[in-house]
Amino acid sequence: METNVPKRKEPAKSLRIKVISMGNAEVGKSCIIKRYCEKRFVSKYLATIGIDYGVTKVQVRDREIKVNIFDMAGHPFFFEVRNEFYKDTQGVILVYDVGQKDSFDALDSWLAEMKQELGPHGNMDNIVFVVCANKIDCSKHRCIDESEGRLWAESKGFLYFETSAQTGEGINEMFQTFYLSIVDLCENGGKRPTASSSASFTKEQADTIRRIRNSKDSWEMLGVRPGASREEVNKAYRKLAVLLHPDKCVAPGSEDAFKAVVNARTALLKNIK
């Protein structure tokens, strides 16, 4: 009598991926990687010279992932060294220090450098990016709040995590989500799955929130010229209110931006006869 023995499910093939770190010097790129791979924090700062390379293995679902990590020096001096390592990358860890505004402002420059080195045929849409707002343990010195960092990341369809290499906060969760997204990319034919969060608000809303956040006065906040009439102020306010009202806009920082617009309108109308 024959019995039907169920076939054993063959394990999924191992996957080899390439990951690079990007960001200014001293933002904690190497410390984040060491915290995850070696479960330790190195308090003494040792600048990365050119490129640090490491290999680690992780398990994602039922699949073994062999990760080649290229930790790139952030100092401009090492551009000629790191520019060879952008190609054939599946994942990017983009790091800034929440206490250094310059490191946050430099994120766009890092993306521009990568785009330039990939050349006209390079496609950054097929790479998983995760933004690490690092050193959140230094809360007293923080100058880039979570909503500003999250807005920048999500407006580009990037993952975003608050991290501390010193305490380990957010590190494991970040890497797990990061690797899972890369596996999804590879299983999706090399195309990055659309991040649901990036579709929840428009570029216009994101750009407007940034403009309001960086405005020097109430006139600039509403986008009207100094000395504008009451009608012009109200018209500008209504347009912004429709765009940013918390009931309609879910972009990070929208509620604060809306309140700022309300206060700006009130302040201007007090001085307009």
Curated annotation (Swiss-Prot):
Q: Which SUPFAM superfamilies match?
A: Chaperone J-domain, P-loop containing nucleoside triphosphate hydrolases
* Chief location bin: nucleus
Cite the effect that the entry attributes to residue 75 to L.
Answer: Abolishes GTPase activity
InterPro entries the UniProt entry points to = DnaJ_domain (IPR001623), J_dom_sf (IPR036869), P-loop_NTPase (IPR027417), Small_GTP-bd (IPR005225), Small_GTPase (IPR001806)
Q: Where does the protein end up?
A: Nucleus
Q: Which UniProt keywords apply?
A: GTP-binding, Nucleotide-binding, Nucleus
- Which PROSITE patterns does this one have? DNAJ_2, RAB
Cysteine pairs forming cystine bridges in this chain are none
Coiled-coil region: none
Query: What is any one of the record's Gene Ontology cellular component terms?
Result: nucleus
Task: Give the binding site residues for GTP.
Answer: 23-30, 71-75, 134-137
- Is Magnesium one of the keywords? no
Could you give a single Gene Ontology term from the biological process aspect?
positive regulation of ERK1 and ERK2 cascade
A GO molecular function assigned to this protein is: GTPase activity
Q: What is the effect of changing residue 75 to Q?
A: Increases GTPase activity
- Please verify whether the record's keywords include GTP-binding: yes
- Function statement: GTPase which can activate the MEK/ERK pathway and induce cell transformation when overexpressed. May act as a nuclear scaffold for MAPK1, probably by association with MAPK1 nuclear export signal leading to enhanced ERK1/ERK2 signaling.
The subunit structure is:
Interacts directly with MAPK1 (wild-type and kinase-deficient forms). Interacts directly (in GTP-bound form) with MAP2K1 (wild-type and kinase-deficient forms).
Question: In which family does this protein belong, per the annotation?
Answer: Belongs to the small GTPase superfamily. Rab family.
Name of the protein in question: DnaJ homolog subfamily C member 27
